[in-house]
Amino acid sequence: MTERALETAAAHATRFLRGLAERPVVAPAGAEELRARLGGPLPEHPSDPAEVVARLAELAEGGLVASAGPRYFGFVVGGSLPAALAADWLAATWDQNAGLFVLGPAAATVEDLSLIHI
């Protein structure tokens, strides 16, 4: 079951968001370091999903920019509001195709309605 993986992701996300005010606004790790950390061969056997999520969070840590934090003034990329983050998680979970109504009626309808606000 994926519950443990989702709980692990939620715990890492919560910890990240709670620490935004204290996080460095510039990622301390460079491209080479991140490639070395995140690269390498794929596992030959299945892995525990929760362990994969935890490992990803650990390896990506030095390459994360605190763009949603209160001290970030680099680019106007905005921050992720809690409701938007949760909605994004649901959208990824539902995995709907908004291209055709028959493939994802709710997603297609939300996409059509969002055009009103553009």
Task: Name every feature range the model reports, one short phrase each.
Residues 116-118:
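Conserved small/polar residues in nucleotide/adenosyl-binding loops
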Residues 102-109, 113:
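Conserved pre-motif C helix in the palm subdomain of viral-like polymerases
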Residues 1-90, 106:
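N-terminal glycine-rich, Lys/His-bearing helix-loop that initiates the first secondary-structure elements
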Residues 94-102:
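Glycine- and acidic
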